[in-house]
Each structure stands twice: as structure tokens, then as C-alpha cells.
Amino acid sequence: MRALWVLGLCCVLLTFGSVRADDEVDVDGTVEEDLGKSREGSRTDDEVVQREEEAIQLDGLNASQIRELREKSEKFAFQAEVNRMMKLIINSLYKNKEIFLRELISNASDALDKIRLISLTDENALSGNEELTVKIKCDKEKNLLHVTDTGVGMTREELVKNLGTIAKSGTSEFLNKMTEAQEDGQSTSELIGQFGVGFYSAFLVADKVIVTSKHNNDTQHIWESDSNEFSVIADPRGNTLGRGTTITLVLKEEASDYLELDTIKNLVKKYSQFINFPIYVWSSKTETVEEPMEEEEAAKEEKEESDDEAAVEEEEEEKKPKTKKVEKTVWDWELMNDIKPIWQRPSKEVEEDEYKAFYKSFSKESDDPMAYIHFTAEGEVTFKSILFVPTSAPRGLFDEYGSKKSDYIKLYVRRVFITDDFHDMMPKYLNFVKGVVDSDDLPLNVSRETLQQHKLLKVIRKKLVRKTLDMIKKIADDKYNDTFWKEFGTNIKLGVIEDHSNRTRLAKLLRFQSSHHPTDITSLDQYVERMKEKQDKIYFMAGSSRKEAESSPFVERLLKKGYEVIYLTEPVDEYCIQALPEFDGKRFQNVAKEGVKFDESEKTKESREAVEKEFEPLLNWMKDKALKDKIEKAVVSQRLTESPCALVASQYGWSGNMERIMKAQAYQTGKDISTNYYASQKKTFEINPRHPLIRDMLRRIKEDEDDKTVLDLAVVLFETATLRSGYLLPDTKAYGDRIERMLRLSLNIDPDAKVEDEPEEEPEETTEDTTEDTEQDEDEEMDVGTDEEEQETAKESTAEKDEL
């Protein structure tokens, strides 16, 4: 038995020695290759684990050497709180996984900034590698993604400190505060923003992360982690980087899309297009090249050339080697961020064509911008920005207005794209403005999706709005009226309603149609310049169209006296003017409401008072009897010249146009506005004392106040005035009946005369035999009937001719 044990032990030792001998491989290699990973999913089987370890190889190191390195490496276990934080980062903090690449490139840019700063005082800082670049390489075969920078690199201690510890202090306190904030439904962005953990976004897409780094003050080291623990060891290959860091991601199976070149290129252009340092992606392209032909191919081609003259020329000339065109796939580094951030340059140094080219590239538009502004803001927060007004309004500009995010302002921090998912960067009414904002002062939270200090964002917003309004104001008048106002006029009106702090600036940008010109629009400044002497109010009339507004009874006397009236023809117009208390010291007057008064002499005043006294019986009769419960009061009008009467709203009531808009909105939402305070207010009934109908009514009621015809006429006038004043009738049937009664009286027809009864036709009697015959031979019966009808018609025609 003992001999068998000894024999078995010898066999094991011989086998082990054979394996070690077979595994010895040369250590030399290049920096371009790094890790690989098996597709096996299970890690419980020893064979699977072995195959996986053999697949993961560092450049120049075989599987056994990798295992030996891992055994010798110093391992660090994440604490329980750090593990919780890691899970929080991976599972909840990031809104989309693709930002891992943005974070890695951003960190690479920071490292390059540091070494460039060091090189200003240390001339040997760049001796290991003079180029400052970021390079990205996809390895589909090994399921690897490499991000390499030639930045400052990290020492062993820095790898442990920077990559091994998420929260540099107060990890438990941070988690407790975050838990409390989540329970209270509060934002955790301010807490998260204190911890720079963008590197760990790599675990969103990777099962394992390996960092190879070389610092000028230390040897090259390898850091490795699977998000549960990490290890650090000196790189046995020596200095293969020169200086800098390579981050290698062993991608998860579901993240394989990030090995596609198009995906990586699009992400670089989306997030890191304006990084200060060049970013290269290892890309392939097909090129047509000329290669020398094989001897057999060349001989065959010469044989095919049978032209004797060509043959003679060839003998005379020096023989050239035969070549052929071949398509080859060529791999090389492709520059991704060739568009330089022109907002970082002084505006005086940027040509107009550069702004236009940048706008087209940035916005994906084919037209030039209508206007642009380039500025640097300083103060509480410093930032650079370029803003553009597009030539035409974006499609669906007012779809889901206010609830839909505006993605036309892109926020950058140190040339790194952060987000365009903002509700607060610009106010809703400026949702058409496109541009970029770049600041070095903005603090970011862990995912860079929201800002840590909202106060700074408000400062930026305030300056952006002011600069945008300055830009719009500088657009030439002809271009503004013909183009800008047609595309974005509604936005400016909404701004007057919504933006209290900039209301005065926005009011100067308003444009409306007016009685001054049949087609041109006018500004409020121009209206005020044309105001009559002693005119203290800006008159406006609202309607569904210009034709409706200018034919309204409310503008008759104003136009006759030469006053200019602004026509509000858009649904938002009346809201806009109501939000403006005044303009240039002049208050607005809705001519469809009370308060329209004219400057009058003493003689005119005496004449008006005499007319009011003359028509006092009619006014009292209308208020107390004919139109009782329908009107607030009846007065002699100062605004009517042609119409007999009009229905005027109180100063705080709804005009006809506003009531129509409110009812349309209520219909869409299913609300009932009949009980609304403004809708239920009674109106003032104004009469024109010079109109023949009104004068005749005065005569009639003096003779008989109970005259039914006059009572009907008063109600018809009221309902007609309701319609002409822009309001809707609650009972159109009753109105129609009264109109019919008035028509009967005008034609001397008895108002109570009945409509003649329509004679009823008796049904024809048919026998059963006839019915059966008809069913049996229907076609024949129809033909016979037709012939008989034609004969009868011919007889009648002959008889009529005889009579004539």
C-alpha cells in the first residue's frame, strides 16, 4: 500500500512539472493589446474558472503568469459601506449607461491637464511621452474596450487612494444622509456631488476593470477590480506606457454594443467633441491601392495585348513593372474631435463664416442662423456661451409646451458635454434658442446629470435671457418683422405673460397689426410716437381676425376721429396685453370695455348731457323693464357712430373675444364656466342716440311703455348687439323666433298665423293577385308601364298643342 502512495505522488509531480514547462512564454509585447475574457457564464465549476483565467491575458503574460501575479498582488477588500455605495452607483445613480465613456474621457482630460500644468515648471515632465492624447480601441475578439491617455498617470499609492476609496471621508455619514433624503423624498444631488466617483461608472458596462498606469515618479502598476474587491501589483512588463494610464474594460455580455465602432464614435462626438486634447479611435477604412502583379498574371496580360504598335513602343521604352488595383482594409487612428470649441476664442477673432459652420455642425441644420451672440459672462459664475436664433421655428415648438424639455441648449463643463436635458437653463418661451454654455465653475453631482448648486444655474439662466433679448433686439427691423415675428412672435407674447422681470424688455419686441396700415405690423414704440395730442391711452380691439376687429361697432368713433387702434387677432394677444400694466407711461384700453372717453370741449360736454337727459326715459325703460336681469345698466354711447347699440363689458369682465377663448378652453377640459365670476358679470348696454331705430323707440315708449312690438324690438336689438360685440347667445332658438316675428310684422303678416298643414297621402290599395303577378314578372311589368307612360305623355303633349 505504501508503495502505491509513493508511485501516485511521483506521477503528480511529473505532471505538474510538464505543465510549467509548457506554459513558459516570452514576456515582451506591445501596449495596444491588453485583456480578454471567456464567454462562459458560470463561475462555480473549476474547469470553467480555469478556462476563464486562461482567456484573460495581459500583453506578454500567459495564463499561469497572470495567476501568479494575482497570487502575489496585494488585495484590498471594500468595506460594507463602500459595497453599498458601489451598488448605489451601478444600479440607481446613472440615468443611462452610455455616460461611462464620457466619464472616462473626462478623467483622461483631467490627467492631461495636470501633466501639461506640471510641464510648465518641469521641463522633463513630458520626456516619457511628448504627445498629449486620448486613444480608444475596441477589441471584439477579446470583448475588451481600452481607453488610453498620456496624462500624469498614477503611482501605486494614488491607485489605492484614488481608485480604491470612493468616499474619501465620512462614508457611513454619507450613506445615512442619502437614506434620510430618499425617505423624505428630497434630492440627493447635493450629497452625491461631494464624491468624485465618475470612474466607477465603468462598472455599469464591465464585469472587470483593469487599470495600467505609469507616473513619472514611480514604476508602472496594475490595478484590477470586479467591483467586490481590488488588487494592486507592480507590472512585470516594466514601463510599456512611457507615461499615462490605460483603462481596460472586460465588457458585460449585454454591453457588447459598446464594441461597435459606430457606437463609440457617436458617443465621443455626443459627449466629448470639444475636449481640449485630441481623441482618436482605432478605426478601419477601405482603400484602393496598387500592388505589383505576380509573374504569371503579368505574362498573361502581356499576351492579351495584341496591338503591334503598342508592342513596339514597349520595346523602345524602359519596361515598367505591372501593377493591379486592390481594395484593402486599413486600420489607423481616426481623429474624432476635429471641431474646435470656437466659444473659447475671443469673439473678435472668429469670422462670421466660422459661426455659421459651427451652427450647422452643432445644430444639424442646413440653413444659416438668423442671428447669433458670442459672449463671456463674469461675476458670481464665469462661463462662455454662443447663442443662435434659427431661421425657422423647430417642428412642434408648442407641443407639450412647458412640460416637454428643451434640448437646444447644451451644457459643457471644461469642454465636456454634461447634458441637454434641462428645464431650467432657459425659460419656456425661449425654447427655440440654440446654443452652448461652457463653465469651469459648475460643481457636478456623481452622474453629472444635475447641478449641485442650483443657485449658480439661476445666475446663468438670468444672464442667458438678457443676452438673448439683446440679440433679438439687434435683428434689423425688416428682417425682424418679415421673418422673426412670423416664426417666433407667439414666444415673445408668452414671455410677456410669464417673465415678470423682463416684461419691459419684451414689450419693446412686440408687434401687432393696427389701423395705421392695412398690412404692415407696428411696434408699441411706433404707436406711442403717432399718438394724438392729449391721448393718454393705447387703444386695442381683439377679434378672431383683422376683418372682425376693424368692423366692430366699438372702433367706429375712434377711427372716425383719427385714433389708431391696435388689432389683436391671435388667441394669446389679449392675455399678453392684460399682463402689461402700461407701456412708456401709457395705459392700455380695451375699446370693448368701459372707460373709453374722449377729450371734449365745454360745449360738447353740454350737448352730451342734454342728449343723455333726453334719452333718460328710454334708458330707464330698458334697464328696469325691457332688458331687466339681462344688463347692468343702459347708457348713451360715446363710441358708436353707425351701429344702433353695443354690449360693453365692465373693466374687469370678459370681452367677447376673451369669452369665446375661455369657452373653447373649457370645452376641451370638460369644465363649466357658466358660474365663473367673470363670465357671470352683467354688461352695459350702450345706445346710439343718433340712430333712427333708437329715436323711434324713444317715441314709442313715450306713447306706450307696454307696446309688445317695442318690447320685442328691444330684446332683438340686445341679442343682435350681443352677437356684434363678439359674445355668444345662450338661446339661439328664441333669437330666431323673435327675428321671424319681426319679419312677419314688417311684411304685414299676422304674427300668430299658423303654418299650413301638409296634406297626408293615402296609401294605394293592392290585391293579392296583383301582388303575386308583380312578383312573378317584375321586369315585364316595368317595361309595359314605361311604354304606357310614354304614350300618355305624347297624348297630353298633342292636346296642349291643339289648345294653343
Swiss-Prot record:
<dbReference type="GO" id="GO:0036503">
    <property type="term" value="P:ERAD pathway"/>
</dbReference>
<feature type="compositionally biased region" description="Basic and acidic residues">
    <location>
        <begin position="792"/>
        <end position="804"/>
    </location>
</feature>
<dbReference type="GO" id="GO:0016887">
    <property type="term" value="F:ATP hydrolysis activity"/>
</dbReference>
<keyword id="KW-0106">Calcium</keyword>
<feature type="modified residue" description="Phosphoserine">
    <location>
        <position position="403"/>
    </location>
</feature>
<keyword id="KW-0143">Chaperone</keyword>
<dbReference type="InterPro" id="IPR036890">
    <property type="entry name" value="HATPase_C_sf"/>
</dbReference>
<dbReference type="InterPro" id="IPR001404">
    <property type="entry name" value="Hsp90_fam"/>
</dbReference>
<feature type="binding site">
    <location>
        <position position="149"/>
    </location>
    <ligand>
        <name>ATP</name>
    </ligand>
</feature>
<dbReference type="InterPro" id="IPR020575">
    <property type="entry name" value="Hsp90_N"/>
</dbReference>
<feature type="glycosylation site" description="N-linked (GlcNAc...) asparagine">
    <location>
        <position position="107"/>
    </location>
</feature>
<feature type="modified residue" description="Phosphothreonine">
    <location>
        <position position="786"/>
    </location>
</feature>
<feature type="modified residue" description="Phosphoserine">
    <location>
        <position position="447"/>
    </location>
</feature>
<keyword id="KW-0547">Nucleotide-binding</keyword>
<dbReference type="InterPro" id="IPR037196">
    <property type="entry name" value="HSP90_C"/>
</dbReference>
<keyword id="KW-0378">Hydrolase</keyword>
<feature type="signal peptide">
    <location>
        <begin position="1"/>
        <end position="21"/>
    </location>
</feature>
<feature type="glycosylation site" description="N-linked (GlcNAc...) asparagine">
    <location>
        <position position="62"/>
    </location>
</feature>
<feature type="modified residue" description="N6-(2-hydroxyisobutyryl)lysine">
    <location>
        <position position="168"/>
    </location>
</feature>
<feature type="binding site">
    <location>
        <position position="162"/>
    </location>
    <ligand>
        <name>ATP</name>
    </ligand>
</feature>
<dbReference type="InterPro" id="IPR020568">
    <property type="entry name" value="Ribosomal_Su5_D2-typ_SF"/>
</dbReference>
<dbReference type="GO" id="GO:0140662">
    <property type="term" value="F:ATP-dependent protein folding chaperone"/>
</dbReference>
<keyword id="KW-0067">ATP-binding</keyword>
<feature type="region of interest" description="Disordered">
    <location>
        <begin position="750"/>
        <end position="804"/>
    </location>
</feature>
<dbReference type="GO" id="GO:0042470">
    <property type="term" value="C:melanosome"/>
</dbReference>
<dbReference type="GO" id="GO:0033018">
    <property type="term" value="C:sarcoplasmic reticulum lumen"/>
</dbReference>
<feature type="glycosylation site" description="N-linked (GlcNAc...) asparagine">
    <location>
        <position position="502"/>
    </location>
</feature>
<feature type="short sequence motif" description="Prevents secretion from ER">
    <location>
        <begin position="801"/>
        <end position="804"/>
    </location>
</feature>
<feature type="compositionally biased region" description="Acidic residues">
    <location>
        <begin position="289"/>
        <end position="317"/>
    </location>
</feature>
<feature type="compositionally biased region" description="Acidic residues">
    <location>
        <begin position="757"/>
        <end position="791"/>
    </location>
</feature>
<keyword id="KW-0732">Signal</keyword>
<keyword id="KW-0007">Acetylation</keyword>
<comment type="function">
    <text>ATP-dependent chaperone involved in the processing of proteins in the endoplasmic reticulum, regulating their transport. Together with MESD, acts as a modulator of the Wnt pathway by promoting the folding of LRP6, a coreceptor of the canonical Wnt pathway. When associated with CNPY3, required for proper folding of Toll-like receptors. Promotes folding and trafficking of TLR4 to the cell surface.</text>
</comment>
<feature type="modified residue" description="Phosphoserine">
    <location>
        <position position="172"/>
    </location>
</feature>
<dbReference type="Pfam" id="PF13589">
    <property type="entry name" value="HATPase_c_3"/>
</dbReference>
<feature type="region of interest" description="Disordered">
    <location>
        <begin position="288"/>
        <end position="323"/>
    </location>
</feature>
<dbReference type="GO" id="GO:0051082">
    <property type="term" value="F:unfolded protein binding"/>
</dbReference>
<dbReference type="InterPro" id="IPR019805">
    <property type="entry name" value="Heat_shock_protein_90_CS"/>
</dbReference>
<keyword id="KW-0325">Glycoprotein</keyword>
<protein>
    <recommendedName>
        <fullName>Endoplasmin</fullName>
        <ecNumber>3.6.4.-</ecNumber>
    </recommendedName>
</protein>
<dbReference type="Pfam" id="PF00183">
    <property type="entry name" value="HSP90"/>
</dbReference>
<feature type="modified residue" description="N6-acetyllysine">
    <location>
        <position position="479"/>
    </location>
</feature>
